[in-house]
């Protein structure tokens, strides 16, 4: 019994301990577990709800995506069609432009090739024609016939007048022109009372005074001041040169400074002109004017073919006396004797170049010599020497055309091939075969 009671007490104690120390934690654990399960069930329910919502959203999104995709595809198809149409239109326009451009280029190339062909054909035709002409005029008779044909054409020209005057007048203005004419008349009156030696002296003294005035610009400017009272100018020239020149020269100088001149240099030109007239007067008295004129002109042609000599005569770094000595040495070495009057005229011209090229100054001198006789000078170029009959006929024809006696100055240029080229003053009559060939070539298309 006691054992039973003991066991009962022990069991009661164990129950007590279990109730107080085991049951509460277990209960709490069970409650916690229950709450956890309940919460998990709630969360599972919520997750299921969310899954349903997600499924619904996915389904809706899928349907929306399909609709959007269909819309995008439809728009893309429409855009593609529009782009294709635009590209096709642009391609058509570009193709048409390329066709037009190609057609223009083909036409341009065709025109260019045609022009080149014409040009080559034209040049070849001119070359062949030139060759035929050269072969034709190689015969002296045929070449002479070209001159005759030109003279026939020239003879048919309408006559027209040409006034003959001192070439220097063409370079001067009205006041100087009147002054030069008056001075030339004064010289003509004085020259009647002078012998040839006095005219030589007059020419030399006038050249010396002209050289002095060319150096002394201030003096020249004072002597050409356009005032009514010429007494101070006459007094000045008397004081400067009366002790060094003769009375005829002083008379010319007084008359010169009494005139009104348009430019300072015209006075020097006038004195040079009168000095030339003095020498040409001597040549006329001695019946040598034709020889003097021909030799002066021939020397101008020499300067054409000897440019080195022209350069030496133009070299102003060399004193004028040295250039005159060079001129005299050249003339002395000539195969024929040079007329002393021609030598004097050429020497004066070289001394008084005053910036003018020697070739132009000497050619101008030849024109002065011709003009003194009231003749027109015609510079004629030919491919070969013309016959005396042709020269006579040319002189007669030109004299009828210009209404004055004409002096023909010939020069030979084989490059002219045939015909003649005539220069009278500023007028050129070109009837050469070479000019016809050049004109034919110039008329070819570019």
Swiss-Prot record:
Regarding the membrane, this protein is recorded as: Single-pass membrane protein
Keywords, A to Z?
ATP synthesis, Cell membrane, CF(0), CF(1), Hydrogen ion transport, Ion transport, Membrane, Multifunctional enzyme, Transmembrane, Transmembrane helix, Transport
Give the CDD domains listed for this entry: ATP-synt_Fo_b (cd06503)
Location(s) in or outside the cell: Cell membrane
Q: Name one GO molecular function term.
A: proton-transporting ATP synthase activity, rotational mechanism
The cross-references to InterPro entries, in alphabetical order and at most eight, read:
ATP_synth_B-like_membr_sf, ATP_synth_b/b'su_bac/chlpt, ATPase_OSCP/dsu
- What residues form the membrane-spanning segments? 4-24
Q: Gene3D superfamilies given for it?
A: F1F0 ATP synthase subunit B, membrane domain
GO CC annotations, alphabetized? plasma membrane; proton-transporting ATP synthase complex
Broad class of the protein's primary localization: membrane
- The answer to whether the entry has keyword Cell membrane is yes
SUPFAM superfamilies referenced in this protein's UniProt entry, alphabetically: F1F0 ATP synthase subunit B, membrane domain (SSF81573)
* Pfam assignment, any one: ATP-synt_B
In residue numbers, the region (ATP synthase subunit delta) covers 169-446
Positions of the UniProt region annotated as ATP synthase subunit b: 1-168
Family stated for the protein in its record: In the N-terminal section; belongs to the ATPase B chain family.
Briefly, what is this protein's role?
F(1)F(0) ATP synthase produces ATP from ADP in the presence of a proton or sodium gradient. F-type ATPases consist of two structural domains, F(1) containing the extramembraneous catalytic core and F(0) containing the membrane proton channel, linked together by a central stalk and a peripheral stalk. During catalysis, ATP synthesis in the catalytic domain of F(1) is coupled via a rotary mechanism of the central stalk subunits to proton translocation.
Q: How does it assemble?
A: F-type ATPases have 2 components, F(1) - the catalytic core - and F(0) - the membrane proton channel. F(1) has five subunits: alpha(3), beta(3), gamma(1), delta(1), epsilon(1). F(0) has three main subunits: a(1), b(2) and c(10-14). The alpha and beta chains form an alternating ring which encloses part of the gamma chain. F(1) is attached to F(0) by a central stalk formed by the gamma and epsilon chains, while a peripheral stalk is formed by the delta and b chains.
Can you name this protein?
Answer: ATP synthase subunit b-delta
Please name the source species: Mycobacterium leprae (strain TN)
